[in-house]
């Protein structure tokens, strides 16, 4: 019989959660020569039998995270029969939650890792929105899930960030009469592009407030009505050329516009 203690970690997923718990426990024991053997994707009694038999012949503990109640019960009963120390790492927690919440658990393996995947997708989308904000790099247009286009102060950046938190990669492109829009904008699927329209009066008010916030006079060309109308006419010519959908953001909060965009995306994906 081996004298080095072994902790077998059985899991119906990758086993990372169980291993972390075991390591946390081991950290309380100084100078221990312990071995952890992770056994992922356990789905049948044969695998359970194999490692319980190994544990019986060594100085071992079997720790397990299994969501299937039948398999959990089997491990516990067989371990007791073979006099193997077995620890149900997640079962008692799920059972207690079910009792207190009066709800039935989903009993799906690997959900923690699905949540982790969602988290990293969100971070990736946020980084994407920053990198391809305000037309900084037109290469992002082809890679984006959604491309927002509009004149200055139509909430392109806050919308990009809001949608990024929904794990959607957004590039945004400013429309300025003196600058031709990037060629990439004319090459993507028009369904991915969304124009942000605003009334001249509303834009004039927003830009004046912006100039005041910067400590500048509100008579600058940036807030001039003739200039604004010129920009909006140019914007309209661009969205007409692309053939994309347009949302009027004049009196909409960012959240309201974002939800409208999400609905459009869902409709387009279902076509």
Swiss-Prot record:
GO terms for molecular function: ADP binding; ATP binding; phosphotransferase activity, phosphate group as acceptor; protein serine/threonine kinase activity. It catalyses: N(tele)-phospho-L-histidyl/L-threonyl-[pyruvate, phosphate dikinase] + ADP = N(tele)-phospho-L-histidyl/O-phospho-L-threonyl-[pyruvate, phosphate dikinase] + AMP + H(+); N(tele)-phospho-L-histidyl/O-phospho-L-threonyl-[pyruvate, phosphate dikinase] + phosphate + H(+) = N(tele)-phospho-L-histidyl/L-threonyl-[pyruvate, phosphate dikinase] + diphosphate. Pfam families: Kinase-PPPase. The keyword Cell cycle does not apply. It is an enzyme of class 2 (transferase). InterPro entries: Kinase-pyrophosphorylase, PPDK_reg. ADP binds at residues 150-157. Disulfide bonds: none annotated. Keywords: Kinase, Nucleotide-binding, Serine/threonine-protein kinase, Transferase. Its EC number is 2.7.11.32, 2.7.4.27. Belongs to the pyruvate, phosphate/water dikinase regulatory protein family. PDRP subfamily. Bifunctional serine/threonine kinase and phosphorylase involved in the regulation of the pyruvate, phosphate dikinase (PPDK) by catalyzing its phosphorylation/dephosphorylation. This is Putative pyruvate, phosphate dikinase regulatory protein. It comes from Oceanobacillus iheyensis (strain DSM 14371 / CIP 107618 / JCM 11309 / KCTC 3954 / HTE831). The lineage of its organism: Bacteria, Bacillati, Bacillota, Bacilli, Bacillales.
């Amino acid at each position: 019989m081996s004298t080095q203690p072994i902790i077998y970690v059985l899991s119906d997923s990758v086993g990372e959660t169980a291993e972390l718990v075991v390591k946390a426990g081991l950290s309380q024991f100084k100078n221990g020569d312990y071995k952890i053997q992770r056994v992922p994707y356990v789905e049948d009694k044969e695998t359970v039998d194999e490692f319980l038999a190994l544990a019986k012949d060594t100085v071992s503990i079997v720790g397990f995270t299994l969501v299937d109640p039948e398999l959990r019960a089997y491990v516990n009963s067989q371990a007791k029969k073979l006099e193997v120390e077995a620890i149900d790492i997640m079962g008692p927690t799920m059972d207690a939650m079910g009792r207190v919440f009066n709800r039935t658990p989903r009993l799906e393996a690997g959900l923690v890792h699905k949540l982790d995947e969602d988290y990293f997708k969100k971070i990736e989308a946020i980084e994407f929105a920053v990198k391809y904000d305000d037309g900084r790099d037109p290469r992002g247009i082809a890679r984006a899930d959604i491309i927002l286009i509009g004149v200055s102060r139509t909430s392109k950046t806050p919308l990009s960030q809001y949608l990024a938190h929904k794990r959607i990669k957004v590039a945004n492109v400013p429309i300025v009469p003196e600058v031709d829009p990037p060629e990439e904008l004319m090459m993507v699927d028009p369904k991915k592009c969304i124009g942000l329209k605003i009334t001249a009066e509303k834009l004039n008010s927003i830009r004046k407030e912006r100039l005041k916030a910067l400590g500048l006079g509100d008579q600058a060309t940036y807030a001039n009505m003739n200039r604004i109308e010129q920009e909006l006419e140019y914007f309209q010519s661009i969205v007409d050329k692309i053939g994309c959908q347009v949302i009027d953001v004049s009196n909409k909060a960012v959240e309201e516009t974002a939800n409208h965009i999400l609905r459009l995306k869902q409709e387009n994906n279902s076509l």
